[in-house]
Amino acid sequence: SYFETTLLTLNTRSTLRGAVKRTTYYNKAGDPIWHVEVTANFTFDGSSAKCTSATASAKSYVSNWKILDTASSRSGNSGTATALAGSYVNGVFVGSMTESVTIYCDKNGKVS
């Protein structure tokens, strides 16, 4: 798996909108299975940063994995997305996986 961070919009010197961080899961062949993604807005002023909103999304790329639930939260200078994915064999549920991804913004607007 890998983490990918993308900054979509930088509105002003103190507001960062649409910062995205995604974790994608691959099978042994290197094909993507599903991902969970957090999109967050931040404010920062050189002394501190605050996450003002966080949204979760998830997507499955294969028919035998389904996204069962997503949730988001924010705290301080971070936003988190959590997804629950279910695995199926011949349409029968065989197990699930929960994964989270968290995005941070520092006091200068640097996202990680």
Q: Language-model segments: which ranges?
A:
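Residue-level signal for glycine
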Residues: 30-32, 91, 109
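N-terminal prepro-regions of secreted/extracellular proteins
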Residues: 1-28
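Short helix-loop boundary/capping segments
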Residues: 19-71
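Extracytosolic low-complexity repeat regions of secreted or lipid-anchored proteins
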Residues: 71-100
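Short, low-complexity, Pro/Ser/Thr/Gly-rich segments in the mature regions of secreted, periplasmic
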Residues: 100-112
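Intrinsic-disorder/low-complexity, polar/charged segments enriched in Ser/Thr/Lys/Arg/Asp/Glu/Gln
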Residues: 3, 35, 78-80
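Compositionally biased non-globular segments, especially hydrophobic aliphatic-rich helices
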Residues: 8-12, 52, 57, 84
